[in-house]
A protein has these predicted regions:
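Rossmann-fold dinucleotide-binding core
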Residues: 52, 78-152, 221
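Solvent-exposed alpha-helices and their adjacent loops that cap or buttress functional pockets
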Residues: 40-41, 114-118, 199-206
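Interdomain hinge/lid region at the active-site interface
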Residues: 149, 164-251
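Conserved beta-strand termini and adjacent loop/short-helix elements that scaffold enzyme active sites
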Residues: 30-34, 102-106, 143-145, 186, ...
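NAD(P)+-binding Rossmann beta1-loop-alpha1 motif at the extreme N-terminus of oxidoreductases
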Residues: 1-43
């Protein structure tokens, strides 16, 4: 049996817990999240998955104080961080805590997190033999933790870019008296463009992007890359989104 520790049982940790309990009878799931009533002892864990809130400031910095404290208090086993962290953070945490720290990105949507975890492939960044025993039957791709950290930001920020682009197209249609729904349908005809993040307004009934992830990830990534071409591409996103997000208040 493999003892799998889960620190933080929000929708990310919760989806992992549900999948393991449903799909792998050779795993014992140990959960630590006192506010939610989970107080399992992680001292016998063979591996730990860590998903906690990490504050991201407007200047792109992250407060890793709590994460460091939690890692230092864990047994000497591989630790996989599933919280979005800036590129290079897992290597930094490995050096500062003395633990083997990896990053394993997640691409779950909060309202469909259980289904998403069930169907999505995974990214493995280390301890392949152990992960293969835990995630039996899961399709995965391998990369370094640094590459995975970049992947997570590239994925999330592209979603924000796509939302912003199609909001700009919808704005252009309004200005010219064209029907955005028809333009939107025409853009999807070739099959080259996936319809995700192309609806205006979005699933929340609002213009622009919102939620817990896109705003903080855009701001952090734009600040981190401000002196290179990528940052120049991302710099206008926040201001544009503020304008689109407030559009429903003006109509």
């Amino acid at each position: 049996m493999i003892n799998v520790g889960i620190v933080g049982c929000g929708f990310v940790g919760g989806a992992l817990k549900v999948w393991l309990e449903k799909n792998n009878s050779e795993v014992i799931v140990l959960v630590s999240d006192p506010p939610k009533g989970y107080n399992d002892d992680l001292s016998k864990a063979d591996i730990v998955f860590l998903q906690i809130h990490v504050p991201t400031e407007d200047d792109g910095t992250q407060d890793l104080t709590l994460m460091k404290e939690l890692i230092k208090g864990l047994p000497d086993v591989p630790v996989f961080i599933r919280t979005t962290i800036l590129p290079g953070t897992s290597e930094k945490l490995s050096k500062e805590t003395g633990h083997k720290v990896y990053f394993m990105p997640e691409f779950l949507t909060e309202r469909t997190h259980i289904q998403d975890f069930e169907t999505q492939p995974m990214v493995f960044t280390g301890e392949l033999d152990l992960l293969a025993q835990i995630f039996v039957g899961k399709t995965f791709c391998y990369m370094t933790s640094l590459e995975a950290e970049i992947t997570k930001y590239a994925h999330n920020v592209f979603g924000a870019v796509k939302v912003t682009y199609f909001n700009a197209i919808a704005d252009y249609c309004r200005r010219l008296g064209a029907e955005y729904k028809r333009v939107h349908a025409g853009c999807l005809l070739s099959g080259y463009i996936n319809d995700t993040h192309t609806y205006v307004p979005g699933p929340d009934g609002k213009f622009g992007y919102g939620g817990k992830c896109f705003p903080k990830d855009v701001n952090a990534f734009a600040e981190l890359t401000k002196d290179i071409p990528l940052g120049k591409l991302l710099a206008p996103l926040h201001e544009l989104n503020v304008g689109f997000r407030g559009f429903e208040e003006r109509i």
